[in-house]
């Protein structure tokens, strides 16, 4: 085992202090976890009643369909086995670049940093990290010409919770106080 110690000035006994630190037993930090309670999907904001399917229409490629719900949400579903264990989700909302003034500068490049890491409801980024730890879930934000978008690549075991995470973000975005 080798170690390198780089300091701003030479002090007597540094080699011995480094050797003692490396030989000391490792102890888990008692203050590393900020909360004793595990974060679960039940900690996300609660929604109202689920919408019902109003129509299902085949579109485009075989297996692709457009689904309209009673709350106005539209879903384009393309179930296929082209990518094993992958579920791609793209949620479009709002008006994207069209929502901004053509004459005033807008820092739309900061949308991902400001909106995604800002939390959901009362959950901050740390709680969201705990919630998604060990799962294939994500939340990328982008601004298109005609819509804002949330994207993620997940897997069959996690896609329902991924959709719930997106819905919660749109329903009750939070602001992480950090």
Where are these regions (language model features)?
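M16 family metallopeptidases and their MPP-like homologs
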Residues: 1-7, 82-116, 120-172, 178
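Proteolytic maturation boundary segments
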Residues: 1-94, 98-101
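Short, polar/charged, Gly/Pro-enriched helix-capping and turn/loop motifs at alpha-helix termini
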Residues: 36, 176-177
